Amino acid sequence: MPARKYKIHVPCTSANIGPGFDVCGIALSLSLSLVVTIPSVSSGAEPLPKIIYTGLDSDNVPLSPYKNLLTRVALYVLRANGITTFPPGVTIEARNEIPFGRGLGSSGAAVIAGVLLGDLLGNLSLPKSRLLDFALMVERHPDNVTAALMGGFVGSYLRELSPEDMSAASIPLAEVLPEYPPDAGPDWGKSPPQPPHGIGHFVRFGWAKEIKAIAVSPRFELATAKARGVLPESYSRKDMIFNLQRLAVLTTALARSPPDPDLIYDAMGDRVHQPYRMTLIPGLPKILSTLTPTSHPGLLGICLSGAGPTILALATHNFEAIANEIERIFGDEQVLVDHKVLNIDEKGSWVEDITEA
């Protein structure tokens, strides 16, 4: 009997979309994909998976199964379901299109890929709601991982948990995904914490078919922790109302066809995170203030993608001209960038059996 082969596909994501801080996310058409080979005969096979990693930032990815995020998350899912080891002889070929540390959900994609990998290797057939629970134990903001798993344009939140469930969900990440020591063996870390059921809830919004996303990514990384570190501990009522009003309008406006540029542009305004991140990204103030639907026909709105430094511009046409203007402003600040015009990934993550007959 031949080895079984499966493909796991996880899209990149952009979170916040202006006023939807820690709430909204969209899945986009760059991806992390895995081809997983599971041998039919395991006698004499290597006990740990072999990892082959290609694509963007592949030089920065550890290939030890006890260090690689994909396999650490997969092992967490397996052990939380009573399976203590990987199936022997597994090969994982990862191909990455998502730049690291640029605000396009690279870590969220890796977490979702790891959860799906664990589900596949354990033959668990977990429902998507349970897969999301496992992902949220690792990546504790729901916007990116929910969009990556479900696809499309989503809004999500973490529900209020009972004291018992809150205790489980608040377990430090170091206990969920421990740093395996060099001498870690098969018996190390066998009893990980169980995620509560139904940690995250979400809804899919509509998305007008005309809208594409232009992602302009500076060639430097911005750690999410650093980008969060500049945010204040509290906000004024005025600023919170500003964001809530715009978020309520934006989630409907992006579904209307044809899109209304003036409505969407104003509705993508934000006072919760972007003003505080201006100093971290040279050129950001000018980009957010000078590109408008009037100056650049086709533009609908512009925002930071996640924590940045990528700029996300939503548009219906004139994509290259919009991207070139953002690139020019970054160039004035001596910042090199790359840009891509992306479609919305409505399907989200999936696993396919690609075994040859």
Curated annotation (Swiss-Prot):
Q: According to the UniProt record, which cysteines are disulfide-bonded?
A: none
For this protein, what reaction is catalysed?
Answer: L-homoserine + ATP = O-phospho-L-homoserine + ADP + H(+)
What does the record give as its pathway? Amino-acid biosynthesis; L-threonine biosynthesis; L-threonine from L-aspartate: step 4/5
Q: Knockout consequence?
A: Threonine auxotrophy; the presence of threonine dipeptides (but not threonine amino acids), rescue growth on proline nitrogen source.
Q: What is its EC number?
A: 2.7.1.39
Q: Do you know which Gene3D superfamilies this protein is assigned to? A: 3.30.230.10, GHMP kinase, C-terminal domain
What's a single GO MF annotation on this record? ATP binding
BP GO terms, sorted: threonine biosynthetic process
Question: Keywords in UniProt for this one?
Answer: Amino-acid biosynthesis, ATP-binding, Kinase, Nucleotide-binding, Threonine biosynthesis, Transferase
For this protein, the record's InterPro entries field holds: GHMP_kinase_C_dom, GHMP_kinase_C_sf, GHMP_kinase_N_dom, GHMP_knse_ATP-bd_CS, Homoserine_kinase, Ribosomal_Su5_D2-typ_SF, Ribsml_uS5_D2-typ_fold_subgr
To which protein family does this belong? Belongs to the GHMP kinase family. Homoserine kinase subfamily.
The record's function comment reads: Commits homoserine to the threonine biosynthesis pathway by catalyzing its O-phosphorylation.
Q: What is this protein called?
A: Homoserine kinase
The organism named in the record is Cryptococcus neoformans var. grubii serotype A (strain H99 / ATCC 208821 / CBS 10515 / FGSC 9487)
